[in-house]
């Protein structure tokens, strides 16, 4: 019982560290006032994370990521992810969304010594956006994860590249950047696979992506 208490205490402390590294609600709302997050981890600590940053050129970067592993292993990867975003965007000043993901992948492979295809395939699926409200422009890059834009009640999906941020058996290719102009009242959504992968309802089936997109149209 004492051992179990130590483990629980350690996990709760890890949650405090993880929470401290994620973007606070106050900062997010100050940067993107009409925004929301829905974050309900299955475990105390999570492999999913989100991050927001506004630079001096009025560019707002926001990202949602889903790291390999659940619970504690996923949480460790999420902390690596938030640290790398700070290093790449804030310190190094890399601003193109595709180059940010290229650099993240390079750093993760290097930091986890993923030199060969036989090594552990740790990494993350991620969506990253760069929004400029004055110019009404949006750039997006994704590793597996998509971007959804709802404009005039029409939903458009921009797919991420079919590769993770990490080492995979497929040939590594540079990430793609999607650029678009936004209209007034457009809604932008990025998300992990958690919501649509939920089992439930009368038949205990997966919620699925199609139902999730219908839900987004109702918001």
Language-model features, listed with the residues they occupy:
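… and, occasionally, acidic/histidine-rich disordered N-termini of signaling adaptors
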Residues: 2-188
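C-terminal catalytic subdomain
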Residues: 178-190, 195-219
């Amino acid at each position: 019982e004492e051992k179990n208490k130590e483990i629980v205490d350690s996990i709760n402390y890890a949650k405090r560290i993880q929470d401290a590294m994620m973007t606070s609600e106050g900062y997010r709302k100050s940067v993107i006032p009409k925004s929301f997050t829905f974050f309900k981890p299955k475990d105390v600590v999570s492999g999913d994370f989100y991050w927001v940053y506004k630079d001096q050129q009025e560019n707002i970067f926001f990202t949602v990521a889903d790291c390999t592993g659940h619970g504690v292993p996923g949480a460790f990867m999420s902390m690596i992810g938030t640290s790398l975003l700070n290093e790449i965007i804030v310190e190094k000043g890399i601003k193109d969304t595709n180059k940010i993901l290229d650099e993240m992948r390079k750093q993760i492979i290097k930091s986890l010594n993923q030199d060969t295809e036989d090594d552990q395939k740790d990494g993350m699926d991620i969506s990253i956006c760069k929004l400029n409200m004055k110019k009404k422009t949006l750039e997006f890059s994704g590793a597996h994860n998509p971007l959804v834009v709802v404009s005039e009640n029409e939903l458009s999906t921009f797919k991420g590249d079919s590769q993770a941020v990490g080492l995979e058996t497929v040939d590594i290719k540079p990430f793609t950047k999607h650029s678009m102009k936004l209209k007034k009242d457009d809604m932008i959504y990025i998300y992990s696979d958690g919501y649509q992968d939920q089992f439930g309802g009368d038949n205990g089936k997966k919620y699925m992506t199609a139902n999730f997109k219908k839900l987004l149209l109702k918001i």
